[in-house]
Amino acid sequence: MKTPQGAEEFIAEQKMIRDEETECANSQYNLGVSLMEQGKLDEAIEAFRDAVADSGRMFEGYVNLGYIYFKKGDLEMVVDVNRKAVQIEPRYARGYANLGFAYLQMMKTGEAIEALNKAIELNPEIVQAWSNLTNAYLQNDDVEMAIETGEKMVEMAPDFALGHNNLASAYFNNDEYKKAIEHLDKAIELGFEPHPEFMKVLEPYR
């Protein structure tokens, strides 16, 4: 890990390289990473934008832009840059997972389901994609698919606390309260803190 002084020196060095080589995408990218690590997000955006402009194939630059825009709460831009990432690298599973999560937050449920299924097709081990897909099916009032997806998720990752919480929600929406309590309790056992209202509505069924 770079010390603050070392990081500042590295940033200065990359800026110097950038100024000397106006079309050096790698230096722009390295500069963006360092600025991002320092929390200088607006400067990092500029560096990554320059990097992807200089290199039409640098999908990693779009990936990092997506992370920054998510930190800034700009979901439209998260979608925009991750779309560009998967256009460059169509087998980039996490790009589709990122798209799916952004669409889910934007209540664009159909797009979320499509993107998350694509992410899982490319890399079934992205547990968060399964979790978000469970929520997307719930958002789409497809409880059966939410349960099926959630069960696959906890079978693959039995210690994924959030996954058990989401599966509990799916079972609750299907009036299967015993199974909802079972998975909620498992989530709590694994260190998850469920929403107090969810715990309250399940209490009469214990």
Predicted segments with their positions:
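Structural signature of tandem alpha-helical TPR/SEL1-like repeats
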Residues: K2-M16, Q38-D50, K71-K84, Q105-K118, ...
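Helix-start (N-cap) detector for alpha-helical repeat units in TPR-like alpha-solenoids
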Residues: A25-N26, F59-E60, A93-R94, V127-Q128, ...
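Canonical tetratricopeptide repeat
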Residues: N30, N64, N98, N132, ...
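A generic tandem-repeat structural signature
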Residues: R57-L122, Q128
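TPR/TPR-like alpha-solenoid helical repeat scaffolds
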Residues: S169-N173, E193-R206
